[in-house]
């Protein structure tokens, strides 16, 4: 879909929010914006950005329908702040199903596949429900196992022969380790591919990062990366080429901007900005996600012509200034994932007495040797030019810290 073909959906969106959104009514009034003057996608630059702070401060003012019409109540994960509520109508839930169905097909899926869901479908988590509905819409099967529980995961794989796993990729090495420890021939299993959610598996040049290499060096499966958020209610999913997540232009208008808010060029890094199309409950205009990605506009070798996003390099709010060096958490994760002895870790970011960032990596107690600490110091220095502090706790305590029951995702990163 070209910008011209997105225009009718954009016009419907502008009319919808101007009539029903208290937040955008106020913004249009304060900025003297005439929505009738915004006739093309290019005209969107006349509108101010919507930020995470706006959503948090005026949450329910974004709602465009009575709450009696809401089918599903969800919240963001609240990684950096309190969770923000999102309200989905029946139409919005169907839009989610359409998105995931098309995303699965982009990742080589079909109605003959059986998906095993290794993430939660409850806890107000939009994506878990979306995956199930997408598989149903496509005509595929799904086994809803949920997060963790390696025994149940393998029992389900052996019993039902799923072909695709949907999981946070850092869980997969644990799954492999469990199989090895329990004499499960995972290489001969029915699994052909893994849809990796929530964490990058590629470097900006599209090569596999250390986590991706760790998985594929042990298990001959195809990895597909995805990028999504509750706010956009849609996903950028890789195709077989593995050259970035494809935009679904029926569901989103994409901008990628620099620090001044101007569009970046082909292949450049910028902040992802989305305008949601076809959303009834809580549509968003020019929403700044805070996520930094490279953008690609050239047609993909798979034949799709929609823009693609590279892996998330970092989040603007998660940028760490440590000993004069700017670091994003994925760079720390990549170093840790390169060390085969490390199967659990947590990165803790804090402020010292002078207000400067400090980084501490928490690791299992059995790794606490002088040789290991020296190896890690050298590795961090060579890869990042700086070395964080290391601290050690029991594996039981670290597992408890990372896999908290009330959390929807592993807490690999903590700010205190």
Regions found by a protein language model. Give the residues of each.
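Active-site glycine/GP-rich loop and adjacent strand/helix microenvironment
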Residues: 1-16, 138-416
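Nucleotide 5′-phosphate-binding alpha/beta core
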Residues: 1-75, 81-98, 102-106, 111-112, ...
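Beta-strand-connecting loops/turns
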Residues: 112-113, 267
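AMP-binding/adenylate-forming
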Residues: 90-103, 114-174
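Hydrophobic alpha-helical segments that mediate membrane insertion or helix-helix packing
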Residues: 76-77, 135
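Short hydrophobic/aromatic-rich motifs at helix boundaries and adjacent loops
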Residues: 44-46, 72-74, 102-105, 124-126, ...
């Amino acid at each position: 879909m070209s910008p011209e073909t997105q225009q009718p959906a954009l016009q419907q969106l502008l009319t919808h929010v101007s009539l029903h959104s208290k937040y955008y009514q106020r913004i249009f009034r304060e900025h003297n914006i005439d929505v009738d003057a915004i006739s093309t996608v290019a005209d969107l630059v006349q509108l101010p950005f919507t930020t995470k702070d706006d959503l948090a401060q005026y949450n329910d003012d974004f709602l465009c329908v009575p709450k009696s019409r809401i089918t599903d109540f969800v919240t963001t994960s609240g990684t950096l702040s309190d969770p923000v509520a999102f309200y989905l109508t029946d139409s919005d839930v169907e839009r989610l199903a359409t998105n995931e169905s098309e995303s699965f097909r982009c990742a080589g899926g079909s109605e003959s596949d059986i998906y095993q869901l290794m993430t939660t479908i409850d806890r107000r988590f939009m994506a878990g429900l979306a995956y199930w509905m997408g598989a149903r819409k496509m005509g595929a099967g799904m086994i809803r196992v949920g997060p963790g529980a390696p025994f149940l995961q393998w029992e389900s794989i052996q019993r039902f022969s799923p072909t695709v796993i949907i999981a946070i990729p850092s869980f997969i090495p644990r799954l492999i380790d469990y199989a090895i420890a329990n004499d499960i021939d995972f290489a001969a299993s029915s699994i052909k591919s893994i849809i990796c959610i929530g964490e990058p598996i590629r470097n900006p040049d599209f090569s596999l990062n250390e986590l991706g290499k760790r998985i594929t060096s042990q298990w001959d499966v195809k990895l597909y990366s995805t990028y999504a958020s509750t706010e956009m209610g849609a996903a950028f999913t890789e195709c077989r080429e593995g050259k970035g997540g494809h935009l679904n232009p029926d569901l989103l208008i994409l901008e990628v901007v620099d620090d001044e808010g101007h569009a970046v060029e082909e292949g450049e890094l910028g902040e992802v900005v989305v305008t949601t199309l076809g959303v009834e409950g809580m549509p968003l205009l020019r929403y700044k996600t805070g996520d930094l990605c490279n953008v690609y506009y050239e047609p993909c070798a798979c034949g799709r012509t929609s823009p693609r996003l590279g892996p998330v390099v970092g989040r603007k709010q998660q940028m760490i200034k440590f000993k004069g060096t700017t670091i994003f958490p994925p760079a720390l994760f990549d170093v840790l994932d390169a060390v085969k002895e490390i199967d659990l870790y947590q990165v803790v970011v804090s402020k010292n007495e002078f207000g400067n960032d400090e980084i501490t990596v928490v690791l299992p107690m059995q790794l606490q040797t002088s040789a290991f600490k020296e190896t890690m110091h050298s590795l961090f220095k060579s890869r990042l030019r700086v070395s964080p502090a290391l601290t050690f706790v029991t594996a039981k305590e670290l597992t408890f810290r990372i896999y908290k029951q009330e959390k929807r995702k592993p807490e690999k990163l903590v700010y205190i």
